[in-house]
Amino acid sequence: MLNIFSLIGLNSALYSSSCFFAKLPEAYAFLSPIVDFMPVIPLLFFLLAFVWQAAVSFR
């Protein structure tokens, strides 16, 4: 079965040492949690559109 978490990049937080994901340079290592979350941000905008339409009663 296809794992949905692998599609949206959440497993990068769990398997950040995997060879599939590149490591950040040392100067940017503190940004690693943000970079791991970045693939999910477009989905949040997609969900925000539904919340917005629910707030205006799907006019």
UniProtKB/Swiss-Prot annotation:
The keyword Transmembrane applies. Residues 1-22 form a propeptide. Keywords: Chloroplast, Membrane, Photosynthesis, Photosystem II, Plastid, Reaction center, Thylakoid, Transmembrane, Transmembrane helix. One of its GO terms (cellular component) is photosystem II reaction center. GO terms for biological process: photosynthesis. The chain crosses the membrane at residues 30-50. It is a single-pass membrane protein. It is found in: Plastid, Chloroplast thylakoid membrane. NCBIfam families: PRK02553.1 (NF002715). PSII is composed of 1 copy each of membrane proteins PsbA, PsbB, PsbC, PsbD, PsbE, PsbF, PsbH, PsbI, PsbJ, PsbK, PsbL, PsbM, PsbT, PsbX, PsbY, PsbZ, Psb30/Ycf12, at least 3 peripheral proteins of the oxygen-evolving complex and a large number of cofactors. It forms dimeric complexes. Belongs to the PsbK family. One of the components of the core complex of photosystem II (PSII). PSII is a light-driven water:plastoquinone oxidoreductase that uses light energy to abstract electrons from H(2)O, generating O(2) and a proton gradient subsequently used for ATP formation. It consists of a core antenna complex that captures photons, and an electron transfer chain that converts photonic excitation into a charge separation. This is Photosystem II reaction center protein K.
